[in-house]
Amino acid sequence: MITKGAKAIIIGAADGSQLGTQVAAAKKSGAVVIAWDRNILNTENVDYYVAFNNFKVGQLQAQALLEGMEAKKADGPYNIELFSGSPDDANAKVFFNGAMDVLQPKIDDGTVKVVSGRTSFSETNTQGWLAQNAQSRMTDILTKSYTNTELDGVLSPNDTLARAILTATKAAGKPNPIVTGQDSETASIPLIMKGEQYSTIYKNTTEEAQAAIDLVSDLADGKKPETKEDKNNDNGKKIVPAVELTPVLVTKENAVEAYKGNDTLEELAKKG
């Protein structure tokens, strides 16, 4: 695309830490570089970032975790465990920081207790977002910390890990804890409707794609795009101006309404 004279390049990076050379070449060619869904790390050569508000995602997950536990058991304290995403994913730490913005005060005042004691991103991350890594870690935590203790809830950053966590708790003969998720994966919607997984996050990627198209259109028309400067979009070299969309928390109660317009997910929610 660079050699063909592209004026704008939209990059959806699987690993945002590996593209420094490529975006430098794009910038040198005069192209506008737009990171889509995941930020591109450790480079000055990213002009814009289009994504859902990932800090808000984490906040919503933590709020859902607390609400789910309170609905199940009115009085705390609540025993919880924390899982975060892959350290090579620029979004993972932002999700976690958003969640801890809500949970840390509850940890500090004793409302919730992380029984394993693992509360940092480095202690809770899941390399590669791999289900087997989350399942193995959950099994280890249950063996070491929950022999005679009830696990009330688990902060899971996405649906794949949520299902792995539930697999581990079932294998250990434990009741299902309140477990959060993200991405509205088709395998998790039935679990949510049955009350096994408590929540997920819906991010309408059609809206996200349209936001990137609109950004390019504004630039082509000579308009200044409406962006925000947010420290959570710091890529290690700069705070990348961002177009942020609003994520939606989904539980059993609002799933059908939340998925209106997405025929596949709406149908799964209606099936229950």
PLM region descriptions:
Residues M1-G272:
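A residue-level marker of the well-folded mature domains of exported/periplasmic proteins
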